[in-house]
A protein has these predicted regions:
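Short, well-ordered alpha-helix to beta-strand connector turns
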Residues: 78, 109, 130-131, 161
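A short glycine-threonine-serine/GTX helix/turn-capping micro-motif
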Residues: 163-169
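Extended, subdomain-level signal for the structured scaffold at the beginning of enzyme domains
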Residues: 1-112, 120-124, 141-146, 152-155, ...
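Divalent-metal (often Zn2+) His-rich catalytic cores of metallo-beta-lactamase-fold enzymes
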Residues: 172
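FMN-binding flavodoxin-like domain, especially the glycine-rich phosphate-binding loop
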Residues: 134, 154-159
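Residues that mark the start of a beta-strand
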Residues: 7-9, 132, 163
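Short, glycine-/small-residue-rich phosphate/pyrophosphate-handling segment
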Residues: 127-145
Length: 211
């Protein structure tokens, strides 16, 4: 059986010191979501690209570097924004110019997602004020200080607040991404993506063994 479905663009916001799995876990989940098109070929449901303050090399906290294809300002239109966490968030939250650019990037997206301490960055923009959110439990005390008006939820693998999804630490971003795939394309598609990754999906948003 062939299908047709819109291809959604995912923009990944990179910064110095991001956590590798925060980015590439969700990216793999999105990339593992495919359908068989009218031509009989497997077609992606998501188109993914990276961006940063400036296009070019961006070093992860764990060492390997990634390549930002676009600057925030020159990036093409996108539907979903992915904001990772990492030790680099400690410097990024103090960079007001970066925070403002991230706020603009979030407003461009239909859906903004954060992984781990990426929610601290979004909190600094003010766009999480009055909204439920979660984050990494090890860095919890620091994160909540970045957004005193945020309705922080400690026991949550991820929190879905419509156009904003936030996840707990590191690997939780994969579960969050799969939940978004389920919302957009059905639970069977999300389970297929998880199976393609040989990943055991925590399907419950409150299934948080680390809280």
């Amino acid at each position: 059986m062939t299908e047709t479905a819109p291809v959604r663009r995912v923009a990944v916001a990179l910064f110095e010191g991001f956590t590798v799995l925060d980015v590439y876990g969700p990216v793999q989940a999105f990339a593992s979501s495919r359908i068989v098109g009218p031509d009989g070929k497997r077609q992606p449901l998501f188109e993914i690209f990276s961006m940063a303050g400036e296009a070019g090399r961006v070093k992860a906290g764990e060492g390997p570097a990634s390549w930002a294809e676009w600057s925030f300002e020159k990036a093409p239109d996108y539907d979903i924004l992915l904001i990772p966490g990492g030790f680099g968030t400690r410097a990024a939250v103090a960079d007001q110019a970066f925070v403002e650019r991230l706020a603009t990037a979030s407003r461009r997206a239909r859906i903004t997602t954060t992984v781990c301490t990426g929610s601290a960055l979004l909190a600094r923009t003010g766009l999480l004020d009055g909204r439920p959110a979660t984050s990494n439990k090890i860095a919890w005390d620091w994160v909540v200080q970045q957004g005193p008006r945020v309705l922080w939820k400690r026991k949550a693998r991820w929190v879905d607040d419509g156009d904003v999804l936030t996840s707990s630490g590191v690997s939780a971003g994969i579960d969050m991404a799969l939940s978004l795939i389920a919302r957009l394309h059905g639970r069977d598609m999300a389970r297929t993506a998880a199976r393609n990754m040989e990943y055991v999906w925590h399907e419950g948003a409150d299934d948080d063994p680390f809280a």
